[in-house]
């Protein structure tokens, strides 16, 4: 129920909230990872050869990592951590690039989502982390934010004449 409100606010307990969180974990997180892994072996991520759509998803991954690192470490705002991962997972499920590099970027996104959610939902994340090909999530290092992934190659600028 950490996504329901900031820790300093009270909220009314709801079975619907528990059911919604369970449904999101099962359908959005678990099923997305299972479907992704069913695609077979993954190539190594080659940042230099990414398309603009792949770069956009990768930017979202690293923006989410940076935001959640701040939310966990400084702000203790667990509800915004969950919201950020939900937003990232929405982008992942809408991403339709099944090329090798597209799948590699999705793998990076799913790895980040599981690692971010692990302090909040440790049991399911432990299993998903191992399914993604890693060891024990309890001893995993936080993923570093790639500053180059945060750079935008095209910026829209409105100019009034």
What is the role of each PLM region?
Residues 10-15, 93-104, 108-161:
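Basic, alpha-helical terminal appendages of large translation-related enzymes
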Residues 1-104, 147-149:
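Long, charged, mostly alpha-helical binding arms that flank functional sites
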């Amino acid at each position: 129920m950490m996504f329901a409100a900031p820790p300093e606010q009270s909220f009314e307990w709801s079975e619907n909230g528990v059911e919604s969180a369970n449904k999101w974990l099962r359908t959005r997180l678990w099923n997305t990872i299972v479907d992704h892994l069913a695609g077979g072996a993954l190539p190594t991520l080659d940042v230099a050869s990414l398309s603009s759509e792949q770069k956009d998803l990768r930017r979202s991954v690293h923006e989410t990592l940076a935001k959640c690192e701040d939310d966990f470490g400084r702000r203790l705002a667990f509800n915004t951590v969950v919201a950020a991962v939900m937003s990232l997972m929405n982008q992942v499920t809408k991403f339709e690039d099944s090329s090798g590099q597209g799948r590699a970027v999705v793998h990076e996104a799913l790895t980040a989502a599981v690692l971010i959610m692990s302090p909040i939902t440790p049991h399911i994340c432990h299993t998903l982390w191992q399914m993604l090909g890693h060891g024990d999530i309890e001893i995993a290092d936080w993923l570093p934010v790639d500053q180059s992934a945060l750079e935008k190659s095209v910026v829209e600028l409105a100019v009034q004449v």
